[in-house]
Amino acid sequence: MPEFLDIRPLTRSAFAPFGEVIEADPASMRLINGGTTERFHALAAAEAAGEGARVIINLFRGQPRSFPYDVDMMERHPFGSQSFSPISGRPFLVVVSEDEGGRPGKPQVFFARGDQGVNYRRNVWHHPLMALGQTSDFLVVDRDGLGNNLEEFFFETPFVIKEPAP
């Protein structure tokens, strides 16, 4: 019998063990440019470690997932953080796991609104990008440099995500 995963709303407090939620936070807002622009300052910290490491900005185009969806693998990046911010304004799913002795534990699933992004801290187990509904573009900030910055883990028995409620 498959183990189904519940989908929870993405909140700063629930996501805190894994990284930061990127969203307009009134507490971090500063007016700049003569008062014509609101800057939401330092919402997440990019990490880039290792030889020749640098922070880069990418555009990812995610294809929508079909449901029910089997979560059969997780990945992590030992040398850098990785952030995803939707620029298509569409929601997406965020799947993360706590580390349990060098492997991912039971995944947790969060529903991110189209105005929320996430920053996975270095070494956080997460599932690859999960766009919903239609092809979606994401601004991705992560690390470039020498060394293998990808570790993958495949579950013997996948976990299952039911279709998210509209």
From Swiss-Prot:
The protein's Enzyme Commission number: 4.3.2.3
Transmembrane segments: none
Name of the top EC class for this enzyme: lyase
Catalyzed reactions: (S)-ureidoglycolate = urea + glyoxylate
Xref: InterPro entries: RmlC_Cupin_sf, UAH_cupin, Ureidogly_lyase, Ureidogly_lyase_bac, Ureidoglycolate_lyase_dom_sf
Key words, A-Z: Lyase, Purine metabolism
Tagged with keyword Ribonucleoprotein: no
Role description: Catalyzes the catabolism of the allantoin degradation intermediate (S)-ureidoglycolate, generating urea and glyoxylate. Involved in the utilization of allantoin as nitrogen source.
Known partners and oligomeric status: Homodimer.
Name of this protein: Ureidoglycolate lyase
